[in-house]
Amino acid sequence: MTKTPEMTKTAIAHGKYIRGSASKVRRVLDQIRGKSYRDALIMLEFMPYRSTDPITKVLRSAVANAEHNLGMDPSSLVISSASADNGPVMKRFRPRAQGRAFSIKKQTCHISISVESAPNQTNTEAQN
């Protein structure tokens, strides 16, 4: 008899139109992906990047969604996926000498973070 895998509950949060480059946000998301919620918060607090503030806000929102909508325990949550996509670019111009103008591109990005409950250690030990 084969056992069907249990459906894992996943809570998702999105942050849209965040000022900052998607590539700079991705370097932070790559470091917290797969970590527990508590470890990720500690890492984000001490990273020297500007993008950690909006990422922390989206992460807290995902955990609040898991706690309120799905009734999950925040201490058992793990970041299952985290991604940053390019958003619209605000184009501005800086006046230069002799009537010229240089373009300024103000990048935005969309951050998506999903959390799910960590696999229970006692269940895996009992199955072995």
Swiss-Prot record:
Name of this chain's protein: Large ribosomal subunit protein uL22
Family to which this protein belongs: Belongs to the universal ribosomal protein uL22 family.
Keywords of the record: Ribonucleoprotein, Ribosomal protein, RNA-binding, rRNA-binding
Pfam families in the record: Ribosomal_L22
Organism from which the protein derives: Prochlorococcus marinus subsp. pastoris (strain CCMP1986 / NIES-2087 / MED4)
Transmembrane segments: none
SUPFAM superfamilies tied to this protein: Ribosomal protein L22 (SSF54843)
GO cellular component terms given for this protein: cytosolic large ribosomal subunit
Upper lineage: Bacteria, Bacillati, Cyanobacteriota, Cyanophyceae, Synechococcales
